[in-house]
Amino acid sequence: MTERECRLALSQARRLVIKVGTSTLTHKTGKLNLGRMERLVRELVDQVNAGRQVVLVTSGAVGAGMGRLGLKEKPRTLPEKQAAAAVGQGLLMHMYEKFFSDYGLLVAQVLLTRADLADRSRYLNSRHTLAALLRLGVVPIVNENDTVAVEEIRVGDNDTLSALVAGLVDADILFLLTDTGGLFTANPVTSDDAVLLPCVTEITPEIEALAGGAGSTWSTGGMATKIQAARLATSFGIPVVIASGLQAGQIEAVLKGEEIGTIFLPREHRAHTRKRWLAYAPAVQGQIQVDAGAARAICKNGKSLLPGGVIAVDGDFDQGAIVSIVDPAGKEIARGMANYPAAAISRIKGRKTGEIGEILGYKDYDEIVHRDNLIVLG
């Protein structure tokens, strides 16, 4: 699909996930920018009134809490961050509920951590709950549960969370609204030569190098985390648009097919929900390194991983474990469920499928990781 075809197809999008960052929602003081919040709500209400379903992933709890608590700098300790999040989350939801109710819409607070999505049963429950809210005409407002999460209070987590939520609800598009108008060839704030990239067909190392550093004083993200979120969402088959959260009408313009922001084109085929869950899985239990041919077969041709393509195994994992598949350079290209334990894979790596039984004394599968239990990330 070309950029133009993809942009025109967005007019048919019916389920939207919109992520808005701290730098868009707050003043430089850290206090909530109520004018921007109200404008954003009006734009989302317009989309609901047009027959679309909207999920809002919002940052800003820590920043809002800092503003209310009078903190001038980011908290340095985890308890301080969580205290700021606890104060700020209440402020955020109070204002969202007020603004949406002015237009007759109900909102629901949904606080998630990766652990909620890593467990298969909790993942399905989250999926069903969000689907029920959308059927009832409620706008789910999602944030990370910063008050109790430990690992999740880190740079860019809500960018990643928005991509995971987009996969969770089977969104038609993910919007990442930020304080820049998209991905540029240089920092548009400091460089007059910066040029907006209207379309990214593949996230290459060169694209990643354009990301620059972290975000503003109050935010925890930056362009790098947005690119990683785009990588994840597009691997699900969901297009991603990075656009300005400071300018009015960006969402509507994108949905009309206008060339606004930077669009990341999705993979042609949408990943099955089971495959998507693999991306939510807890920390992988091992790593399998493959040769260039196997990497190409997995990424380009959608093939299973066979023993002949394996060059190294790291970790002591059992059959059924979630493993990371990396290319010869060590870059993760896929994630999947291993059909054999690590010790067995080490013995059959580089060998032909027909030799598995002779080497191991048994042969349960032809593949190390079957394509039905594998999601391509790179």
Swiss-Prot record:
Domain PUA, chain residue ranges per copy: 285-363
Domain of life (superkingdom): Bacteria
UniProt entry tagged with the keyword Transferase: yes
Biological processes, Gene Ontology terms: L-proline biosynthetic process
EC number(s) recorded for this UniProt protein: 2.7.2.11
Transferase in keyword set: yes
Gene behind the chain: proB
This protein's name: Glutamate 5-kinase
Molecular function GO labels: ATP binding; glutamate 5-kinase activity; RNA binding
Annotated ATP binding sites: K19, T178, D179, T220, G221, G222, M223, A224, T225, K226
Keyword annotations from UniProtKB, A to Z: Amino-acid biosynthesis, ATP-binding, Cytoplasm, Kinase, Nucleotide-binding, Proline biosynthesis, Transferase
Residues holding substrate: S59, D146, N158
Pathway: Amino-acid biosynthesis; L-proline biosynthesis; L-glutamate 5-semialdehyde from L-glutamate: step 1/2
Family according to the record: Belongs to the glutamate 5-kinase family.
GO CC aspect terms: cytosol
Role noted for this protein: Catalyzes the transfer of a phosphate group to glutamate to form L-glutamate 5-phosphate.
Enzymatic reactions: L-glutamate + ATP = L-glutamyl 5-phosphate + ADP
CDD domains: AAK_G5K_ProB, PUA_G5K
Pfam family, one: AA_kinase
InterPro entries for this protein: AceGlu_kinase-like_sf (IPR036393), Asp/Glu/Uridylate_kinase (IPR001048), G5K_ProB (IPR041739), Glu/AcGlu_kinase (IPR001057), Glu_5kinase (IPR011529), Glu_5kinase/COase_Synthase (IPR005715), Glutamate_5-kinase_CS (IPR019797), PUA (IPR002478)
Localization, UniProt: Cytoplasm
